[in-house]
Amino acid sequence: MKPSVILYKALPDDLLQRLQEHFTVHQVANLSPQTVEQNAAIFAEAEGLLGSNENVDAVLLEKMPKLRATSTISVGYDNFDVDALTARKILLMHTPTVLTETVADTLMALVLSTARRVVEVAERVKAGEWTASIGPDWYGTDVHHKTLGIVGMGRIGMALAQRAHFGFNMPILYNARRHHKEAEERFNARYCDLDTLLQESDFVCLILPLTDETHHLFGAEQFAKMKSSAIFINAGRGPVVDENALIAALQKGEIHAAGLDVFEQEPLSVDSPLLSMANVVAVPHIGSATHETRYGMAACAVDNLIDALQGKVEKNCVNPHVAD
């Protein structure tokens, strides 16, 4: 008899078929308490869980006594109670490598669109404001040869550094938990403390996961240390930034502009002051949102669940010691 798994995110037909070759698949719309209650028998028997954008906490796990592995279609897993999963010896799988290049593209797009004011001036053209040769009030700022500061030199940070160094001749500063020899050798990147990075960078790109240590890592103190001409980019996790402090820094002119793919609360409220600022490019968490990459992430998540329930956790496992 095939193991039972619960799928709470739609999959392309071919990936669903692959999942069904290995498991009895039960599809649900979400992991809300109502859904769990209505499908209590299915949740009680499930050995696997696959999906994204839903919280998996101790309350849910109490309803799933046979759960052995959960696979998320994402690299981030701050919506999972890792301690609760680990305590119950449940494997947590994620997709850390598939989206690297695409998210780096998004970061570079935010750098370019904020510096050159692409969104703002495009809207002015649509509004009929382009009636003569443009003047300085339409101008942006250069990207090439400007200093890029990267906070978090992981896979995505490396991919961004590659684009910035080779494509735009940008000097690279970085701050991370440890020195990154490859970044220093390939891109001539310079390791520095966070204060130095903030003071010297023309662009500050934040690429950090959300943890207890990184929550509100960026606040009023950090923005005050940046150049008034600096542009802030966040494509990591929204709560790493104190959003009210960011808004204040933009309003006071402490920083020049911001390109944001993530926010403290998502979706972003239509009443957010960020949406009324011409110098803010706000996009709806599109970091990995291409057809090709989202398919690749889903395929990876399917393979991860198959591997996990077969006892193979050599890669893409957040808590591999559970399998020991």
UniProtKB/Swiss-Prot annotation:
Similarity comment: Belongs to the D-isomer specific 2-hydroxyacid dehydrogenase family. GhrB subfamily.
**What Gene Ontology molecular function terms does this protein carry?**
glyoxylate reductase (NADPH) activity; hydroxypyruvate reductase (NADH) activity; hydroxypyruvate reductase (NADPH) activity; NAD binding
How is the subunit organization of this protein annotated in UniProt? Homodimer.
Indicate yes or no for the key word Magnesium. no
Query: What is the documented function of this protein?
Result: Catalyzes the NADPH-dependent reduction of glyoxylate and hydroxypyruvate into glycolate and glycerate, respectively.
Task: State the Gene3D superfamilies in the record.
Answer: NAD(P)-binding Rossmann-like Domain
Q: Lineage from the top down? A: Bacteria, Pseudomonadati, Pseudomonadota, Gammaproteobacteria, Enterobacterales
Q: Which organism is it from?
A: Escherichia coli O7:K1 (strain IAI39 / ExPEC)
Q: Indicate what this protein is called per its UniProt record.
A: Glyoxylate/hydroxypyruvate reductase B
Active site (catalytic residues): 237, 266, 285
* InterPro entries, sorted: D-isomer_2-hydroxyacid_DH, D-isomer_2_OHA_DH_cat_dom, D-isomer_DH_CS, D-isomer_DH_NAD-bd, Glyo/OHPyrv_Rdtase_B, NAD(P)-bd_dom_sf
GO CC field: cytosol; plasma membrane
Q: Identify the domain of life.
A: Bacteria
Write the gene name.
ghrB
